[in-house]
UniProtKB/Swiss-Prot annotation:
Belongs to the phytoreovirus minor outer capsid protein P9 family. This is Minor outer capsid protein P9. Disulfide bonds: none annotated. The lineage of its organism: Viruses, Riboviria, Orthornavirae, Duplornaviricota, Resentoviricetes. The keyword Transmembrane does not apply. It is found in: Virion; Host cytoplasm.
Amino acid sequence: MGKLQDGIAIKRINDAITTFKNYKLGELKQGGSMAINTLSNVRAHVGLAWPAILRNCLIHTSSHLGFMKFMIDIATTWKVGAFTLLGSVGDEDPFTDVDLIYTKTCLHLGLKDNDFLQFPEEFAYEANSFLEAQSMNAKVDMLTGVHNIEDKYVFRMQSISKFLKAYYTASEDVAYLTGFIKPDDSKDSILNAELLEAQVTSEVLRVRNLITTKIQKYINLYEDSQLPHFRQAALSYIQDWDVDGGVPAALPQPDTTDDERPVTKPGPSTPTVSKGVDEPEDEEMIRKKVETSKDAPSKADPPGNVSPRGVPALLEDDMSEMDMPDGFHDYLTREHENNFDLSQLGLAPSV
């Protein structure tokens, strides 16, 4: 593969950062998602540097929200090969120094090269180990590996679930994560620091809500699935998230939006769930909140980010044709006869 010139290396990381900055929840559901195609292309050209690039995207404030949505998508998709997007391509590292190139890319994009979240050391180590392990373990041989893809799917989902749980635990103290913000004495610097702190806090809380909502939805859809790989993944989620009776016992019930609709089994009561838009607050909105909060009396923190929610019935479009007896293999057979493309299964190209 050889070493990449700085210009090309910066372009690759530029594409990754920009994609995660604009990543929308549910990109994996789209057959021709530009975001997924771009990430697949970057992955195919950066070799063993892929986990280091993902790690930087996880902890940088500009790409953090999008990266976590990407991980949530992989953890809750029916595309059993989507986890291969975490695997590296080839056995060479074309970068001389990934972190240095990442810093140069931030400057090229007009981003601060020191706006990195400060996760607890234990999670930082765990996240790095997770991404390095997936770099190797998420690879699938396109000739022989497809035959046991369901087994690999279960193992990968278990690993991703543990990563999300570790993130959830590490992000309980949002103030700790924003401790990197150290403004100077100028008015603009103080305001910008407050804006960034408000933005990071909002995004971390949003990610925590998305995790609990989407994990719960996956469990409700697949814990009784007749397809063993979906059922096993759902059962492992139940164990990891201490779910009892369809509600995460140790986790708050999050606010919901169009992308975050919780889905539970039909019950006698199906109240309406409020809807919103899955978009982070824009800078102007955050700026107004910060300036307003200066004059407002301080309030005690609420007991938790909890909002009552109803129990909506299962939506028909949430049910997959693959959640039927032998549905998955029938689906593969039918699609193969119709010139089936493995990318539609969520299998990222490995070469």
